[in-house]
Amino acid sequence: MTSYSISVSVKGTNINKYPGKQHARRVAARLAKQKGLIYLPGQQTVLSEDSDQARPFKQRRYFFYVTGVVEPDCHVTYDIAEDKLTLYVPDFDFKRTIWTGPTLGKDDAKQRYDVDAVEYYSSLEGDVQRWAQGNPSTPIYILHPDQKPVTPLTVAYLYESKSLQHAMDACRVIKDEHESEAQIAGLFIDVCLSLRSRGTAYQTIAASGPNGATLHYTRNNEPLAGRQMVVLDAGAEWDCYASDVTRSFPIPSSVSGKENSGKGDWPSREAEEVYAIVQRMQEESISRVREGAMFFSIHQHAHSIALDELLRLGILRIPHGSSKADLVKAEATALFFPHGLGHHLGLEVHDVAPDSGTVPVTSSSSSSSSRVTAVTAQCQDGLMSVTEHRPPCTLSAPPLAAGMVITVEPGIYFNRLAIDQARAERDKPGSKGRFVDFDVVERYMAVGGVRIEDDVLVTKDGSRNLTDAPKGQDMLDMIYDRC
């Protein structure tokens, strides 16, 4: 049996430990407070309804960010003034140990995690009370009002639930060296599952033929026979971090009667043409990712490629009396590319995004306001589509910063429902359907959809593609065993 190992080194004294203390300090600095107590609960064991069996465990991401702990029933506090990170683990329960095995113990936790102290949960209430009594006018920072530490005197304490999440979101969006190398690189299926991945980061999408035009198709229960393409959107979860990768590839059995010598690898000319468009959209988009770039502008560039290519194929058209600007204003490309170019990636597959202005200004991002003004002007002039999506595909999103991890996932889709609706509305002024040649579109319907998605780390001087799953010609060579 082939074995795999991943060894991660982190600058500092806590080699191979998740940098929870470093993250706690970063959050405190973002809060800009000299004193205070941060409290975060981990995910507690929850039984399924009417059952004595626990639901599948998934750690709370904010708790994990400052601890690195992937165990249930834990809590953490961070004393800002004392720079002390304390982890609370479940009290020893002999019966539970017999039935389900030992829970995380104090000595084991101190050895495994980057914390200053480890206590049993039974100490939490008293510790919080003593801290509050010694700091009567200093707040205890919590994420939500319903996450106060369990204590009979909660109403007497000064809780603050407005600042912590904003501070943590601003910190989480910047990935440090440990996160980028240990949590994202090498996440994909063969290595992750052979190690200790807890499973996928989201429901796998395996959509063949027309199902590939449904963005989040998860039924995954239809046969491949007679279909041209498969969209496989799948990502592993590793120590609470998500990957998000998509590949679209031809079904080999659909390439019938062809000699696979590097030519004729596609089930149809239409499938090959659509794939080439999406590949160009992605390659040019990734080349524009760098610190200081406005992702919304990159998203719009991908749309401009789609527009030119769909016009070239005759899928889009400019009717008599109309102009290309009219086509852009109608957002006709959104009929075939209806989603944002990408999203933040981290502890969640659709990770948190910073509020506008919360990412530190750098020399490369200091002109972000002027860039937003320029992009806005282009939208108003009809040179770009103006539809916004999930951050960072918004005009108000701050510029990309080094350390962010984003997905870049353009796609072209031929969704029957959307196409039929556009056809029904094509006589309406300003409608998308006015700019579509539906006879040409019918030739492409069997393709379904094509999406290519990589996970990209923003760096000071550009970007680093963290995804090494093959695509393009390398993908075809692997499919047809030419590697």
Curated annotation (Swiss-Prot):
Q: How is the cofactor bound?
A: Binds 2 manganese ions per subunit.
Which InterPro entries does the record match to this protein? Aminopep_P_N, Creatin/AminoP/Spt16_N, Creatinase/aminopeptidase-like, Pept_M24, Peptidase_M24B_aminopep-P_CS, X-Pro_dipept-like
Q: Which residues bind Mn(2+) 1?
A: D244, E409, E453
- Protein keywords: Aminopeptidase, Hydrolase, Manganese, Metal-binding, Metalloprotease, Protease
Give the Enzyme Commission number.
3.4.11.9
The residues forming a coiled coil are: none
Keyword Protease: yes or no?
Answer: yes
Statement: the UniProt record of this protein carries the keyword Protease: yes
Residues bound to Mn(2+) 2 are D233, D244, E453
What the entry lists under SUPFAM superfamilies is as follows: Creatinase/aminopeptidase (SSF55920), Creatinase/prolidase N-terminal domain (SSF53092)
**Job of this protein:** Catalyzes the removal of a penultimate prolyl residue from the N-termini of peptides.
Q: Which family does the entry's similarity section mention?
A: Belongs to the peptidase M24B family.
Spell out the protein name for this chain.
Probable Xaa-Pro aminopeptidase MCYG_06503
